[in-house]
Amino acid sequence: MGKKSRVKTQKSGTGATATVSPKEILNLTSELLQKCSSPAPGPGKEWEEYVQIRTLVEKIRKKQKGLSVTFDGKREDYFPDLMKWASENGASVEGFEMVNFKEEGFGLRATRDIKAEELFLWVPRKLLMTVESAKNSVLGPLYSQDRILQAMGNIALAFHLLCERASPNSFWQPYIQTLPSEYDTPLYFEEDEVRYLQSTQAIHDVFSQYKNTARQYAYFYKVIQTHPHANKLPLKDSFTYEDYRWAVSSVMTRQNQIPTEDGSRVTLALIPLWDMCNHTNGLITTGYNLEDDRCECVALQDFRAGEQIYIFYGTRSNAEFVIHSGFFFDNNSHDRVKIKLGVSKSDRLYAMKAEVLARAGIPTSSVFALHFTEPPISAQLLAFLRVFCMTEEELKEHLLGDSAIDRIFTLGNSEFPVSWDNEVKLWTFLEDRASLLLKTYKTTIEEDKSVLKNHDLSVRAKMAIKLRLGEKEILEKAVKSAAVNREYYRQQMEEKAPLPKYEESNLGLLESSVGDSRLPLVLRNLEEEAGVQDALNIREAISKAKATENGLVNGENSIPNGTRSENESLNQESKRAVEDAKGSSSDSTAGVKE
């Protein structure tokens, strides 16, 4: 969105002439592809691998300097052309203007009073860059032959963007010319800036994003140079790493899912004008109207003339914002830290615990989240920890007898403990685990706060330090919360307080004709609030009834900018890992839906 550009926007119109030969770059990219396709490094070796990959990438960037396609002037010089183009093609352009909000970057400012829930912005399909428009473009022949482009719409969209940027007469030039020339995603971080993220929970995703992007570039460089269907692509003679990083970041920070024209499925899209809106806390207020075939956005709240118009991107953590959007949101009520937990197969009760978890729809090993808000754990994590800490007798109670299914229903409900002893154990475990994670950081909370007072820090360095500080603060709160809960349940146990009795009327159950197939609503989607679908995530802005009528892609946890659930992310990454093992042509865009 507008916030992504804090740097000078280079513009010129054509690529410069470089002396480096395609064969020389081909040799370097082959080396890069081999390095990026090697097995994952062992514990403690990720940084070393990152530096090695980065060294190769920088060598390629240096040799390609001057080859990239750029434009003349500043980004904002093209805003009038964008508004004119949008207006001529049926988009709304009244009631707002594009303005530089300094720290937040460019955004939309109201030029009149706008009421909450008022429809103020709409963008018809013809203005959107989509996977479908990519298929029908000069990229089409290569798309029809390359299985990576076919399988990963985000990569297809990135190449679509590159091809159109290199085509002076492209229909989308008025839009493309207003995109930032650089972003603040970790793909653009200097090595010293990435170093600030060492020991954080987010660093693994940063490494993965960088490695996957480098691997994709190396693979596609060879495709562009050797595939017969790539001969007519306008980027054939100037496909640089810098170009690919830019395209990937443009897509990563902006893409969303919209319905196809017949409404039968979804497709990825870039949405001009709308993608200038910056983020604030709130609710999803963007939808897709199939009847009018356009993206629509209603006001999140009342906006007076002269105020910035915000939208809600969704329930993203700050790690997701930094890695995928290139900014840190200071007042993020949805911030959280990933925590990997699993039942050891060496546990003598493993089989029983695995069965109880399976009945609750929870895997024996997964990535959960510790939340900034109270309570620090979700119903899914509570259920997992309860099973993790169960005795053999408690496990039997959840597996055998007429009341077993009822006990499964209560696993994620804090009002119905398995036992006081079980609660003491799980909160003790969580306290210890969060404490151990805190000790892995190389700096303290106080030291981070002190460093942030240094005005010489770059914007990206500040983001990195804020991110690691935020992680520590969440972990510290989790430790304190766990300690309070531990003592409360210990007191209940010492006083031999009676356990609350479960009654079916206490919980909402999913309707089903087969009793044993019912699952408690609270456990149905693992860590549902930890992330959301990679979709245009559009909640009905006015009413659910109208949403159904208009054919909007809805979802309470859906958000703009291509976020997805942690479970979905893990599943997709697993599939990608399998594909990567098959050969160099299997590649992915980590975090660039993503």
Curated annotation (Swiss-Prot):
Keyword Cytoplasm: yes
Localization, UniProt: Cytoplasm; Nucleus
Protein name listed in UniProt: Actin-histidine N-methyltransferase
Pfam families: Rubis-subs-bind, SET
Effect after changing residue 256 to A/V: Decreased binding to actin and decreased protein-histidine N-methyltransferase activity. Increased protein-lysine methyltransferase activity toward an actin mutant with a Lys instead of a His target residue
Residue ranges, annotated region (Disordered): 1-22, 549-594
UniProt effect for mutating residue 215 to A: Decreased binding to actin and decreased protein-histidine N-methyltransferase activity
Taxonomic lineage from the root: Eukaryota, Metazoa, Chordata, Craniata, Vertebrata
GO MF entries: actin binding; histone H3K36 methyltransferase activity; histone H3K4 methyltransferase activity; protein-L-histidine N-tele-methyltransferase activity; RNA polymerase II-specific DNA-binding transcription factor binding; transcription coactivator activity
Biased composition (Basic and acidic residues): 573-582
Domain SET: 94-314
Group of enzyme by EC: transferase
Family stated for the protein in its record: Belongs to the class V-like SAM-binding methyltransferase superfamily. SETD3 actin-histidine methyltransferase family.
Source organism of the structure: Homo sapiens (Human)
